[in-house]
Structures are given as structure tokens and as C-alpha cells.
Regions:
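Internal hydrophobic alpha-helix adjacent to the cofactor/substrate pocket in enzyme cavities
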Residues: 377-400
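Extended, charge-enriched "interface" segments that sit outside catalytic cores
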Residues: 430, 436, 447-616, 620-624
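Conserved beta-strand-loop-beta-strand element in the redox core of flavoprotein oxidoreductases
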Residues: 127-143
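An anion/pyrophosphate-binding glycine-rich loop and adjacent beta-alpha core
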Residues: 38, 54, 182-319, 417-500, ...
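Conserved N-terminal/central alpha/beta ligand/cofactor-binding core
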Residues: 4, 21-125, 140, 152-172, ...
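Beta1/beta-strand and adjacent pyrophosphate-binding region of the FAD-binding site
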Residues: 2-15
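Short hydrophobic core segments
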Residues: 10, 143-154
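A glycine-rich dinucleotide-binding beta-alpha-beta segment and adjacent secondary-structure elements
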Residues: 305-371, 400-413, 538-592, 597
Length: 624
């Protein structure tokens, strides 16, 4: 049988779901192919969304019209804003979610999108004609044809799972691996390699002595992931904190000979920033304890996730070690932790739309590009889905985000310019324009662009316009309203900050670290009048305005730096040079430029091994 579509998406994980939703919402006739329709959007590891830098990616995905933020808000059982003790450039939202409800909310969301079909099957072969992807053949013998193909297969491509010395093919616990699909891509010259990840044991809550652990409740303020204001619907639950000890470590060390990480079974590279418990012991032998966070898997389940205890040790060693922790002395488990090795493709062979440079019409997103994390996958999936749909339109429009526009832009630029030799995880430190990429202003950066593309809907765009207008009004009031010392000094003295010696504007007061719009509103009539007019989401608008006031100088300074770099971004160099013939450029520079074939001079400047003098040579050759 044969079926025709505009876009086919392979894999129903976080990248695939966002890709399929984006393409279909833009009007492309789309088919999502997944092994199990009942596990769409499955959180394969921890039941949480967001975190440092990851939360910003979710906010950006939401601002672009993606679904992850909405679904997270609807299924959250705990919310926290991380890094709140630091500046707003690094504030990062994070939520625990109900794993089962998260899956069904994704299914409900996809089922409601016109133009989107879901097909339960397994991709077996990428169909290619004249270096252009034209379709997919499945293990059931079905042929699906399309103008654009998005591959977002997660850990399923030649997945191999490890528990102690036991190993078996699988893409996830009790799910099959995809055996031949990688080869149908790599045979066209796309480099394939292996990576490893892992997950911890799941524990029965009824067997845990929670009263012997430190409870960690969530927060109840106004912050959310979606700018659309989805109310929290589920019962909010705490997490718990405890620590490993010497007895735990001794037990784990006794089993290292059977650990696939240390007995030679696993040869691929795992995530540096999410190491297994056995890796922690080997890397930090002098540490007497490591923190463990017990996280609920859902509102109505006893299954608990033990964050910090990822392991592929034999099951009996895992259980014996866990029971050496006082709170887990009677622990019962649902399933062991395990490691999994899987295929990924060299992301330097993609352009910034995530389309392959070798096979036209083939887009890759998520862990198949060497990243780790639901959020990184979702951001890539959204970009791939948008560009897959644009390609079907027959025009030359491309959706690409710069490094000063989004963390997603930073992520994709890092992947395509630098490549990966270990699973890539986003951090705020990877972004050079952090003050421009805050979690509070992703809508300001991205929503209008997404609306014009057709991926963000009118209600989202209208809300952004309303929010923008109210922020502007508050800033005008603050910039233009004078304050007399007699009106404000009693309040300033009461909170322990210096009184005014002369009059000033409200903006000058808010610039002080101790003062806020919310705190000044009851005292200053002009501020109270404008904030009382806010129709909804008052706290969100006030916070956004306050951040713009307090960090105005930093924002303007960073924008100047970013604009200077834009000049290099605008200098297109792809296809203009035979780098091997440019002897003025260093040998390493010629090799890297030839391999990556950067699109712009700015991208070339970020390639490891390309020196500033190499860039100057290119500038001279371009007559700049």
C-alpha cells in the first residue's frame, strides 16, 4: 500500500510530536509514524520538564506556537523557578509532571490537529531518489511518500540496553529497537556513531520511609511555562531529598566488575552532566555522599523516580545499595535502572534548518543529532517541522534563529558548527547573550515571527500584542512620573534603603535592588492606577516591565555586541570558496571549513580550529 503526504515524521517522542504538530498547524498534510500510539510524548527518563536553560527552551518553544509548555502546565504536579536567587538572565522554570497524563495530553493535542494522521508502525527504510528523500518504507510493507521527511527516532536506532552483563536490543524498556533504518541513511554518506544514556531504578512509594527524608515542596506563585496561562489542574506534590553513604558506595564498588560501563561492554560516550551513580564513585572517589532526589511519577501512582541514581549495574547490586540508605531500607522496586546505546548522526552535516546537506528533504531532530534532554529535542523538532512544512510550499523561505534570538538558535548553531563527541546538554553558559534570552521575554523575541509563519495562532499573537502594550504603558508611567522625597522617604527608611535627597522618576526608584513595582504600587498613585487597569496576568506583566527597567543598561550593552556580530552573520560564504586552495588559511582551518562548509562568516568564526587570522583572510578575500 502507498500513501502520500507533505511531511512524514518518524518517531513520536518530544522532537517528533513538536515537528508533527508544527507542520500540520502550518497546513502541511502530515503523518506521524510511531511504534506505540499509547506512548506518544513519553518521558523516558525523569518525569520532569525544564531546568537550567532547558526551561528557557520550553518557553521559546511555547512562544513559537509549540505544545510542550501547554502540556506541561496542564499535567504539572510541582513547579519551581530555579536560580531565583540570581539575576533574571538565568531564571529557569522546572516542573514535575504526571507521566501518564502527560502522554495522554499529547495524544489529545495531536488528535485535535487537522491535517495530522498518526500511523502505528516501525520505519524500516528511508526512500531516496537522486539524493532527495521521497518517503519511508515500514516493516509492515507500507510505503509512505512525502516532500519532507523528519527523523526523530530518539534512542531507538539500533538501541542496545544493558543491565549488568545482560544486554538485549531495545529502544526503551520493553520496547523494540529499530534495526535497519540507520543503515538506509548512513549508506548515503551521512556519518553515524554511537552514544549512551541511562535511567535509574523506579521505587514503590509505599516501601519508603518518607519521614526520614527532607521534603521539598513546590512553589505556588504565578510562573508557568506557557504564555497562554493554562491553569494548574492537578494536585501539587512534594519531592524528597536524601543522600548516599559509605555503605552504599562500598556495595556499588563491589559490583563494578559487572558494570557494563567498566567491564568493556559499553564503549560509547554518555552524558557528562548526568553521570551514572557508578561513574560518580569512580570520578569522585573521595566524596562520602551524593544527593538523591525522590520524584513522584504522577498524581495517582506509587511509582517514584530516584533522581541521581542512574545505573546499569546488576539488579541485585542496585537493590542492595539502595537498601543501605536508611529511608530505603525496605525498598521495593518496579524495574531496574539500565543503560542504552544508540545511533546518532553527525549534526555538522545539517544546515541551520536541520535539513541534511547530503539528502535534500531529510530533516533530523532530537537525540539522533547527539543531544540529550526532552527540551532540546522539542526545540529541534519544532524547527525541523516548521522548515519541513516550508519546503513543501515550494518557495525559498527558511526558518532560522540566530544566537541572540533564542537558546534553540544557540543549540542548533553549536550542533551544526561544532558537532558533538558526547551527548549535548544546554546550559545558560553556552549562550553569550543570556540577558537577551531570558525566560520572561521569549514571546517578545519569537511570537510575531511564528505568527507570520502560521505556526503560532491568532489568540497567542493577540495576547502578546496586549502584553506588549501594557508593558509599554507601565514603562511610560515609570519614566515620566516624578516622585517627591516627602512622598517616598518614609517607605524607603522603613525597608532600610537610602532616602531621596531630591526628586526622581519612578524608574530611578525601581532601579534600586531593594525596590519593586509590586512593593511601590500601594504607595505611588500613578503606579497603582496603571497596574489596577491590567486585565489579567498582572504579576507576569509587572515582572516583565520591572526586569526591563532594572536591567536596561545591561540589555542595551548586550544588544550592541549582538548587533556587531550580526554584521558577520549577514556575510554569506557558503559555496564561495575552495578552502583547500587558500594556503593563507591554517591547515586545520582549511580542513574544518571544508568539512563544515559554513553558511556565514559568523558561523565560520565559531568553528573550533578556525582562528581569528583565518577569518581575517576570508574578510580580505571578500573585500571587507
Amino acid at each position: 500500500m502507498k500513501f502520500n503526504y507533505d511531511v512524514i515524521v518518524i518517531g513520536g517522542g518530544h522532537a517528533g510530536c513538536e515537528a508533527a504538530a508544527a507542520a500540520a498547524n502550518m497546513g502541511a498534510k502530515t503523518c506521524l509514524v510511531t511504534i506505540d500510539m499509547n506512548k506518544i510524548g513519553q518521558m523516558s527518563c525523569n518525569p520532569a520538564i525544564g531546568g537550567i536553560a532547558k526551561g528557557q527552551i520550553v518557553r521559546e518553544t511555547d512562544a513559537l506556537g509549540g505544545q510542550m509548555g501547554l502540556i506541561t502546565d496542564a499535567t504539572a504536579i510541582q513547579f519551581r523557578m530555579l536560580n531565583k536567587g540570581k539575576g533574571p538572565a538565568v531564571w529557569s522554570p522546572r516542573a514535575q509532571c504526571d507521566r501518564g497524563k502527560y502522554i495522554w495530553k499529547w495524544r489529545e493535542t495531536l488528535d485535535a490537529i487537522p491535517n495530522l494522521d498518526i500511523w502505528q508502525d516501525q520505519a524500516d527504510e528511508l526512500l531516496v531518489s537522486d539524493h532527495e528523500a521521497i518517503g519511508v518504507k515500514t516493516v509492515w510493507g507500507i510505503s509512505l511518500y512525502a516532500k519532507s521527511i523528519v527523523v526523530s527516532a530518539g534512542t531507538f536506532l539500533n538501541g542496545l540496553m544493558h543491565i549488568g552483563r545482560h544486554q538485549y536490543p531495545g529502544g526503551r524498556c520493553a520496547e523494540p529497537a529499530v534495526a535497519h533504518f540507520s543503515e538506509s541513511i548512513s549508506k548515503w554518506g551521512i556519518s553515524v556513531a554511537r552514544m549512551k544514556t541511562g535511567t535509574p531504578v523506579r521505587i514503590d512509594k509505599r516501601s519508603i520511609h518518607l519521614d526520614e527524608m527532607e521534603e521539598q515542596p513546590g512553589e505556588t506563585d504565578f510562573h508557568q511555562f506557557s504564555y497562554m496561562g493554562t491553569p494548574r489542574q492537578l494536585r501539587q506534590l512534594p519531592c524528597w531529598l536524601c543522600y548516599t553513604n559509605k555503605d552504599v558506595h562500598d556495595t556499588l564498588r563491589s559490583g563494578l566488575a559487572d558494570s557494563p560501563l567498566y567491564n568493556g561492554q559499553i564503549k560509547s560516550t554518555g552524558p557528562r552532566y548526568c553521570p551514572s551513580i557508578e561513574t560518580k564513585l569512580v570520578t569522585f572517589p573521595d566524596k562520602d555522599q551524593h544527593p538523591l532526589f525522590l520524584e513522584p511519577e504522577g498524581e495517582n501512582t506509587n511509582e517514584m523516580y530516584l533522581n541521581g541514581f542512574s545505573s546499569s549495574m546488576p539488579m541485585e547490586i542496585q537493590l542492595e545499595a539502595i537498601r543501605k540508605i536508611p529511608a530505603f531500607r525496605d525498598a521495593k522496586t518496579y524495574r531496574p535502572g539500565y543503560a542504552i546505546e544508540y545511533d546518532y548522526f553527525a549534526p555538522t552535516l545539517l544546515d541551520h534548518t536541520l535539513e541534511s546537506k547530503i539528502i535534500r528533504g531529510l530533516f533530523l531532530a532530537g537525540q539522533v543529532n547527539g543531544t540529550t534532554g526532552y527540551e532540546e529535542a522539542a526545540g529541534q523538532g519544532l524547527v525541523a517541522g516548521i522548515n519541513a512544512a516550508l519546503r513543501c510550499g515550494g518557495g525559498n523561505e527558511r526558518f532560522v534563529m540566530n544566537r541572540d534570538e533564542s537558546y534553540i538558535g544557540v543549540l542548533i548553531d553549536d550542533l551544526t558548527s561544532k558537532g558533538v563527541d558526547e551527548p549535548y546538554r544546554m546550559f545558560t553558559s553556552r549562550a553569550e547573550y543570556r540577558i537577551l534570552l531570558r525566560q520572561d521575554d521569549a514571546d517578545a523575541r519569537l511570537t510575531e515571527k511564528a505568527y507570520r509563519l502560521g505556526v503560532a495562532k491568532r489568540d497567542r499573537y493577540d495576547w502578546w500584542l496586549q502584553k506588549k502594550e501594557w508593558i509599554h504603558r507601565i514603562l511610560q508611567v515609570c519614566d515620566n512620573t516624578p516622585v517627591k522625597p516627602a512622598d517616598i522617604n518614609p517607605y524607603l527608611e522603613n525597608i532600610g534603603t537610602a532616602p531621596l535627597r531630591m526628586g526622581c522618576k519612578i524608574t530611578d526608584l525601581i532601579g534600586r535592588p531593594q525596590l519593586s513595582i509590586q512593593g511601590l504600587t500601594p504607595i505611588l498613585p500613578a503606579l497603582r492606577e496603571i497596574t489596577d487597569q491590567l486585565p489579567n496576568r498582572k504579576e507576569e506583566i509587572m515582572e516583565a516591565a520591572e526586569i526591563q527597567i532594572k536591567y536596561k543598561g545591561y540589555i542595551e550593552r548586550e544588544r550592541i555586541v549582538a548587533d556587531k556580530m550580526h554584521r558577520l552573520e549577514n556575510i554569506k560564504i557558503k559555496g564561495r570558496f575552495d578552502y583547500n586552495s587558500l594556503k593563507e588559511i591554517s591547515t586545520e582551518g582549511r580542513q574544518k571549513l571544508t568539512k563544515i562548509n559554513p553558511e556565514t562568516l559568523a558561523q565560520a568564526s565559531r568553528i573550533p580550529g578556525v582562528s581569528p587570522s583565518d577569518i581575517n583572510v576570508l574578510l580580505v578575500l571578500l573585500g571587507r
